[in-house]
Amino acid sequence: MENYNQTSTDFILLGFFPPSRIGLFLFILIVFIFLMALIGNLSMILLIFLDTHLHTPMYFLLSQLSLIDLNYISTIVPKMASDFLSGNKSISFTGCGIQSFFFSALGGAEALLLASMAYDRYIAICFPLHYPIRMSKRMCVLMITGSWIIGSINACAHTVYVLHIPYCQSRAINHFFCDVPAMVTLACMDTWVYEGTVFLSTTIFLVFPFIAISCSYGRVLLAVYHMKSAEGRKKAYLTCSTHLTVVTFYYAPFVYTYLRPRSLRSPTEDKVLAVFYTTLTPMLNPIIYSLRNKEVMGALTRVSQRICSGKM
């Protein structure tokens, strides 16, 4: 029996799990994915921190991606699981605002960080002699800090808006987290101006970075094609294909969800797509980056040997 215990300012998250065996199966699957994401991303962060061979700009950026993914999935899944287990789907007005802020901030930061990672590979392959200068430690810190700051400013603007608009009597959000577009549908006012702002924000944080990434890899693939070393060509192709896989998994569902007009959107479809970028992508990223990556596997072997020999 579901217990909402709703006050006048609470929201209700209708959730993702149906009240059936299918819902229980999906719950177990999501929790498993969550645990895999925690283990994978924590392992990647520790591995890059502990092994000096991975103290390069590429892996420094990768460690930040794992940190974002770790926080990203932790913002969504614990509340999602708690609602299913307790049957209490209510979330306070403030709690909804906090969840919405962190989701938007982390999502924006990750989109910009993926563009920074593409720039790193572009410089490494197309301008190898300039790489130590263009991708210095200071530049990496600026990229990461900039991603967090810009993502947070964007999230703050969206969160302040949804916390100050008047809501109708129904406060049931047809989603499993406080997604801003899902909250806006409950507003007792015309929100077409804001929907245009969401479109613009999505274009800035997703479309423009994706175009930049595509252009970077176009140049990279051209440079790789002219490489004389077969081994170097293979390594470059592997690195680029890995990053492009991650970019596709992250950007595609986001763009499809947020660039469509409200009239063409389905709450059920939005929730299914949201599972991809809130749970599956954070779980898959460390697997994709470590699979067939000799440097990561070599670092894992070295760190494991140090742990076993007690030299940590």
Curated annotation (Swiss-Prot):
User: What family is reported?
Assistant: Belongs to the G-protein coupled receptor 1 family.
* TM annotation in the entry: 25-48, 57-78, 100-119, 139-157, 195-218, 236-258, 272-291
In UniProt terms, what function does this protein have?
Answer: Odorant receptor.
On the tree of life, the source organism's domain of life is Eukaryota
The GO terms describing molecular function are: G protein-coupled receptor activity; olfactory receptor activity
Its protein name is Olfactory receptor 2L3
**UniProt topological domain (Extracellular) ranges:** 1-24, 79-99, 158-194, 259-271
Q: Name one GO cellular component term.
A: plasma membrane
**Membrane topology summary:** Multi-pass membrane protein
Keyword presence, Ligase: no
Pfam families linked to this entry? 7tm_4 (PF13853)
GO BP, sorted A to Z:
detection of chemical stimulus involved in sensory perception of smell
Q: Where in the cell is it found?
A: Cell membrane
- Which stretches are Cytoplasmic in the membrane topology? 49-56, 120-138, 219-235, 292-312
Which cysteines pair up through disulfides? They are: C96-C188
Gene3D superfamilies in the record:
Rhodopsin 7-helix transmembrane proteins
Q: Which UniProt keywords apply?
A: Cell membrane, Disulfide bond, G-protein coupled receptor, Glycoprotein, Membrane, Olfaction, Receptor, Sensory transduction, Transducer, Transmembrane, Transmembrane helix
